[in-house]
Amino acid sequence: MAMLGAEEFGFATSALIVLGCVMMRKCHMNTCPVGVATQDEELRKRFHGRHEYLVNFFTFLAREVREYLAELGYTKLDDIIGRTDLLMRKPSDHIEKHDLLDLSRLIHLPEQAATQTIHQVTRQLHAIDNVKDVDIIRHAKAAIESGQEVSLDYAIANTDRSVGAMLSGEIAKRYGNIGLPENTLHIKFKGAAGQSFGAFLAHGIHFRLEGEANDYLGKGLSGGLISVRPPVRSNFDAEKNTIAGNTLLYGATGGEVYINGRAGERFAVRNSGAIAVVEGVGDHCCEYMTGGRVVVLGETGRNFAAGMSGGVAYVWDKDHTFDYFCNMEMVELSLLENSTSRKELHELVRQHYLYTGSTLARTMLDDWNHYVDEFIQVTPIEYKRVLAEEQMRKLQQKIADVQRDY
């Protein structure tokens, strides 16, 4: 690959095999028989991989590469990058189809290679000096440095990627994970946001998007608030249309997201603390979720809650078909029978209406006693057991305190 021009190489699968992977292709099913890709405690006991195995593997790999380089008369990998003239085609194996292959264009070495370097010698220019975050940071200086409330307005296009990441980085430099005080920085955007809108958004920032968003909205969300709604003049039903892409809230640890419309696949994958309300999702929603709350006011795709080990999801099951779309290996379904869950769901739907003006949320709130009975609560079995044990521990402590006082 180096001779064909590669300068970076991936070893993911081979490294997993060194650690014991037997390629059963069950990584997504939580049934890995050797404990590499599973949350099952019994299966994880079967994992016998050690870091020394990886050290040995890459040491021997590097040694073999050095030996091949020595055979060719070179001392560094850089010396052979792009050197297609060093490649030779195997002799014919007399298979007619193989003889028809013309590899000349693949292994062609340009004339410029004799006078110019054909491997990387200068760092890539990422051109981040003029991205939108630079302007936001400049205008939000009062909020960042002294905590004053600041409101800003921007147009946004799908070429504006990772908006909010550099801003949150500036805040993290000063305040760490604490972020800014509540409701310090309000920024309204209009347009189609690019990928990773609101990535790693820090506490105290509210991004309000009027338009639509691409994939990875709220990636690594760290306490910020993002609300998305269709353009004010749009005439379509928001709850029937997708206005945000795939893999939203990937790895989020905190914060809130309210979307007045549907989202794509893998919504809230690896969410570990954020709150989200959306009006429909694609496949694999809440995949590997470990914490937080997710409310789906609409249809879901298949494989809902696969690998979900923490947090709680509430799904509006108006057609009574949700159990077909839910992966039941690690979760259980129930109606909202206790007042705590009902109050929590009501508050989340109310907040969704306040931030997005959702027509669907308003309809539900106006006839709450009817709609609340159509919701299904999704709770991880192990998570529910831990909560029950914690409640029992608190009850026992309370009884012990009463007995001590008397």
Description of each model-found segment:
Residues M1-G5, D85-H98:
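Short glycine/threonine-rich loop-to-helix capping motif typified by GTGT followed
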Residues A12-A15, K76, G211:
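Glycine-rich, histidine-containing beta strand-loop boundary motifs that form or position
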Residues A12-A15, L19-M24, K90-P110:
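Sliding clamp-binding short linear motifs
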